[in-house]
Structures are given as C-alpha cells and as structure tokens.
Amino acid sequence: MKKVVIIGGGVLGSQIAFQSAYCGFDVTIWLRSEGSIQRTKEKLAMVKQEYIDAINLMNTEEGKSFNNWCRGIADTDDFNVDKCLETVEKAFISINLELNLEVAVKDADLIIESMAEDFDAKKDFYKMMAPLVGKNTIVVTNSSTLLPSKLAKFTGCPNRFLALHFANSIWKNNTAEVMVQPSTEEKYFNEVVEFAKQIRMIALPLKKEKSGYLLNSMLIPLLFSGLDLYVNGISDPESIDKAWTLGTGAPKGPFKILDTIGLQTAYNVVLMYVKVPSFLAPYNFKGMEKLLKKYIDEGKLGMSSGEGFYKYDK
C-alpha cells in the first residue's frame, strides 16, 4: 500500500491521517466544503503539537514509563528525539486536503471512512463514492457503532469492505480493531491487518461482527452510566469522574473521555437509542440527548473546541 485516503477530517480522521503520514504513507483527506479545510488544518496543527509534546515527554525519565510512552511514535530501544520531531514536521506538510472526491480517491490503495456516526449520511456517501472506487482499492469504515454489513451493499465492493476501528489518541493508544463482515474476502482482511501494523498499531482481529467492537463494547456502557448519573441529578461530572479514576486507577473518567471523543459523536450515538421505550431502556437516553444538544448548541464540543464538560487551553 502507498496511497491512503481519509474520508472526513474530524477528531479521529485527522489523527489517522497524521499517523499514516508519520509512517510514510501518501495521505489525502477528503472534505465536503471549503469551510472544512480551515477546521481540518486547525485539527492537524493540534495533532502535530500533541506529537511534539509526546516526543518531548518521551525524552524524559517520566516519559519512559509504560503509561506515558507513545508506542505509535517509536519503540523504546530505537527512540531518537530529533529524528521523531523531524518525521512529525514532514508528516504535517505532506498531508493533502481535497474537495473533489474523484481526485481524492484516484489510485487509492486504501480508503478509510471516518465520518460522524450517522447511518444515512454514510449510506449516501458510499453510494456517491462507489462508481469512483478502483477495482483493487480496499475500503474500510472507522464507524464506532455501525456494523459494516449494514453498509457493505452501498460500497460497490463488498468483498473489499471491512471495518478498521481506532482508539482516540492513536499515537499513544495504538490499537486497531480489524473486523470482517460476511462478504469480506480473507486476503483483504489480511492486508488491512498488515497496514495497521505498518502504521505502528497493535492489530486486534475480530472474527465475527460485533457492534462496538472490543473497546466500545466495554466503553459505551461506562459513558452511558456516567451520563445517566448526571442527567438524573445523582452527582456532577467531576465527582463521577473522580469515582472512576480514584476507584480504578484509570487516567480518565467518563466525562473526560466524552470531551476527548467529542460531544457531537456522543450525541450521534445517543440518538441511536432515544427511541427505545423508557420501560425497556436501561438509561435515561432522552435526558442525555437534551443535555448533549444543549452543550453542542452552546459550541461546547469537547477538547476540540476548548470546552465541553471541562475547559481546555486551545
């Protein structure tokens, strides 16, 4: 593989693009509008700074600890701070931003769809892109909750379509869940596993489809539980986070995680559950929808906007 195309320049899309470029791939991000270009440039600049900060930390004794070492950047036995910083600069200037979809996907070896969690939007996009996809191009979705089998028939290449799911802050949390759907041919699954390794991810294969993969099957119930405690007036975000971090030793509680993921993404996931009858729903999804919409309407989208449940330095 040589050319990798990322569909969408959001939080994870920008990270996937940067990590792929950092590892030497020719990377293009496809964006829908002129307005998206500036927003994506800003996200890429933020990701670049995250890499620089991580590399500088890795060059200290504190940074050499297991919890601080960024395995997506370098191994401990061949770490060279100057070389890593130079690679970051090269990656940053090498990423192409493109508005023309046909131009973006031309000669692509791998297309990684990283759009918001909206089934209809994804379906419409795949139907639009299908005639443009090369006969040898592999297409993957980074969807957090949607099964790839639900989208496969719209891609035009179901045998070359599967899921490749990344954790947030992929330079540090370097896992890549690779999941088949019934039409996926094994050789393309193996190629995606190999790509994940080439961009310094730990590939986690899923032999069957599972909504939420491995990580989100465990993570989403945590986030829902935290939100449920808040919207039902049980406690506040900071106290809920402390209960989790101090009680388990985890670095972040549910609300810090929500800010990292982005509240728009969280809102889109909650919308998938709002219509569940209240007597069947294990959580107060309507309360969560109202809460998250209020934050989004106020421009509080999480870390990317400088404020969500917490405030951040931009």
Give each language-model segment a name:
Residues 13-16, 120-123, 146-148:
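Short glycine/serine/threonine-rich phosphate/pyrophosphate-binding segments
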Residues 28, 202-203, 215-225:
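Structural/interface elements that position substrates and couple domains in central-metabolism enzymes
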Residues 50-138:
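Rossmann-like NAD(P)-binding element
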Residues 138-208, 216:
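Rossmann-fold dinucleotide-binding core
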